[in-house]
Every structure is written in C-alpha cells, then in structure tokens.
Amino acid sequence: MKIVALKEKVKNETRTAITPEVAGLLIKKGYAVTVEKDIGLYAGFLDEEYVAVGTKISSVPLEIISDADIILKVQPSSVTDKYSELEFAKQGAIVVGLLSPYLNHEYIKAAAKKNLTTFAMEFVPRITKAQNMDALSSQSNLVGYRAVIEASYHYTKAFPMMITAAGTISACKTLVLGVGVAGLQAIATAKRLGSIVAGYDVRIATKEQVESLGAKFVSPELQEDLEEESGYASESSADYKAKQEKFLAKIIKGYNIVITTAQIPGKKAPMLVTDKMIESMMYGSVIVDISTSTGGNVEGSEPDKIVTRHGVTIIGLLNLASKIASDSSKLYSKNLYNFLTYALQDGQFNMDDELVRDMLITKDGKIVNYIIREKYESITDNG
C-alpha cells in the first residue's frame, strides 16, 4: 500500500502531513511512503531526513498523486489547484486530513464525484481511545499558546510585574473567552509569562479547569450550562446572550489582553466582543481572535489581518498553528499515524468500527456522513 503527501498549497500553510519520524514508522509497518521534494522544508524537516528512513522523494507531483492508495493532507486542496487529488488521484483513493467539511462544500462534493474515500480528522470523537488521534486538540493546544505569544509581541508593555531600582512595572491582565483546549493553553501560557489571568466559558465544568491553572473563573450569575454531550458548547438562548453581553461589557475594560477562542462546530462563531466593548478598553490593549475563519468572536476582526479600532489592536490571523510549524507538524503527523494504525486492518479500513465510520465523509461516490449530508441539503434548500 502506497501512502503519499504533497506540499500544502493553501497560502501560509507551512505544516506537513508526514514528518520523517512518522514516515519511518509507516515504512517499518510495511507501507511504501512517497513525499514531494522539500515537503517539510518550512517546518524544519530536510529531504535528507526522509531519505534516511527509507522515504521516496519525488519532484513530480502528478507521479506521486496518481499512484497513491492513501493521500495524507493538512488542509484540503482547492478545486482549482494544479495536481490536485480531485483531478489526478485514482478512483477509490483514500484522503485523510483536516478537510473542514462544514466549510469546504465544493471540495467534499468534488471528492464524492471523483469517488474518493475521505476521512476528516476534525471528526475524531472525543473519547478516551481516540485521544492520540485528536488533531483538533493537538493543533488547538499550540494555537492557544501562539495566540498569547502574538498578543505579547503586539502589546507595548511587559506581561509580568517587575520591581526594579527605576520603578515598578504592573502585571498586565489577560481575559480568555472560551476555555476549550486552546483557551486552557492560552491561560497557562499567559500565567507563565506573569500575567494576571481570568477565563470565561458558558460550560460550568470549565470553572474547575480554569481555577486549576491558577486563574480566576468569571461568569454572570445564574450561569446557563451550554455543554453538549460531545463536550463542545452549544448556542445560548437570546436571554443568556443579552446577559452575557452585559456582563462582558462590564468587565472587559479592566483587561489589557483578550484572547477569544469560542467556536461551535458547524456553525458561525458566537459574537462576544462588540465594538462598544472595544471602545471601552484601555488604549494599547490587544485582542487576539482565533475564530475568524468561522466568522470571529470580535466585531471588526478580519480574517488574516491585524487591525486597530479605538486604539486597540485586533489580531485575526488565520492558522496560528503554522507559525510553529515544526511542533504542530510533529503532533498532527502522529495523529494521522495513530488513526491509520487503528483503522487499517490487513490493508483495509475497518468500516465496521464506529470511530472510523464517524470520520468517514465520502465513499463510493456519495457523501455518507449524515451530519455533513444534512448540512449541505439545508444549504441547498435555503438557496
């Protein structure tokens, strides 16, 4: 069985789906691995490292893709990409990656039409046996870290309190909105840098997690618990949204750094920080909105841009994981490896396994994942 990966085509995507370490592990299991020349260059992996573990290197993408049984990706190709699996992969080839099926309708439909079997790493279920495959968590962890680093770079003051002969510098105050994997890592990183940190979330269970990191949990009184069985947050009621907005408007002006991480799978990110709130913040404050790919949590934030409103810097950079491409590639590639070793039995994907089926998006020319199929049907029905 031939497993391949090409260089990522998405702008500013510097991660790679196969690291030399994982290539070596796959080869030891009997798979033939081929990657495109310089595939890991921007993540700090040289071709020599791949060759050393037995990987074949090719500078001809068409040759790689047309002969592949399994294609590993970080992000999906565009339907217009040159040498895309959508055009040149053989029918029945398997594609595994962060395919963003909620957003990339054209890709998923084209993959089904091409008769590709696709697995979305976003759909790894949040269960114990799948933890080592959980790419969303591994990447979100690094995104939370990087969000704080970006904030500290654009903030014109120090994070920790410093007492010097020339005077005392006060510690900055950081507020993290949304305490999932990214939010918890943002809290931990800001604490390590010496900031005074608070966390906010609509899920009551996160209070203990925030406090375990030495941060303060802040929330409106009579908090409505919006945690679903999946562990993700659900949408709040109109009444709670109004109460939430009033509460955040009251407290946000006391913070120098705000990190927003709130997302709802398959839906637009909730708006948390209004323009009026931004106007109330201290001049020179910094907001990092890591949810701009799904609409953003901050009014006025723009995808992949840094803007200033009312003297506040708003960072809406996409794909923060690519700013630490080496480590994010190591973790993501290992997630892929763990999924493959779990799902493959005698060279075939075990479609009888519920975990494998949950991740399956297209097969035999059809969109087989009912969540995605219903999502696309609703979009079509609504014009």
Curated annotation (Swiss-Prot):
Gene Ontology molecular function, alphabetical: NAD+ binding; NADP binding; oxidoreductase activity; proton-translocating NAD(P)+ transhydrogenase activity
Known EC number: 7.1.1.1
Residues that, per the record, bind NAD(+): 131-134, 181, 201-203, 231
GO biological process, one term: NADPH regeneration
Reactions it catalyzes: NAD(+) + NADPH + H(+)(in) = NADH + NADP(+) + H(+)(out)
GO cellular component, one term: plasma membrane
NAD among keywords: yes
Keyword terms of this UniProt record: NAD, NADP, Nucleotide-binding, Translocase
Database matches in InterPro entries: AlaDH/PNT_CS1 (IPR008142), AlaDH/PNT_N (IPR007886), AlaDH/PNT_NAD(H)-bd (IPR007698), NAD(P)-bd_dom_sf (IPR036291)
Assembly mode: Heterotrimer of two alpha chains and a beta (PntB) chain; in Rickettsia, the alpha chain is made of two subunits (PntAA and PntAB) and forms a dimer.
Function: The transhydrogenation between NADH and NADP is coupled to respiration and ATP hydrolysis and functions as a proton pump across the membrane.
Family classification: Belongs to the AlaDH/PNT family.
Protein name per Swiss-Prot or TrEMBL: NAD(P) transhydrogenase subunit alpha part 1
Native source organism of the sequence: Rickettsia prowazekii (strain Madrid E)
Gene name tied to this protein: pntAA
